[in-house]
């Protein structure tokens, strides 16, 4: 049950962040929103919420609570909240999106359903 609960929390935050990502959105606010919800549930966001994608797979803007910049239309960035339980398991759900004036276009086409297969847990 703990894995399912953590998955649900990460997914809730991943989907909420997708609704926040748009031209002019505060990077700090998006990251703090996830950090605060994780903390309310007893977890930490131990890595940044995301980063830019362009000529390099990890480039500016780095989406974290220390970045005072805003997202701009036509940026390609990731949204990748994650929770990790050392020695036990971790959950990260990641999308790559194109920022637009009114929101974002999700470039990742994978399903986000939680599936259990043969006593192992698969996050798809």
Q: What would you call each of these model-derived segments?
A:
Residues 1-124:
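Active-site neighborhoods and metal-handling regions in enzymes and metal-associated proteins
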């Amino acid at each position: 049950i703990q894995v399912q609960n953590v998955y649900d929390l990460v997914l809730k935050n991943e989907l909420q962040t997708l609704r926040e990502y748009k031209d002019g959105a505060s990077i700090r606010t998006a990251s703090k929103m996830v950090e605060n919800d994780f903390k309310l549930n007893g977890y930490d966001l131990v890595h940044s919420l995301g980063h830019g994608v362009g000529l390099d797979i990890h480039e500016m803007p780095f989406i974290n609570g220390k970045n005072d910049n805003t997202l701009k239309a036509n940026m390609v960035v990731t949204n990748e909240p994650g929770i990790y339980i050392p020695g036990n398991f971790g959950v990260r759900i990641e999308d790559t999106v194109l920022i637009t004036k009114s929101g974002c276009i999700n470039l990742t086409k994978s399903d986000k359903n939680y599936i259990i297969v043969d006593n192992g847990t698969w996050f798809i």
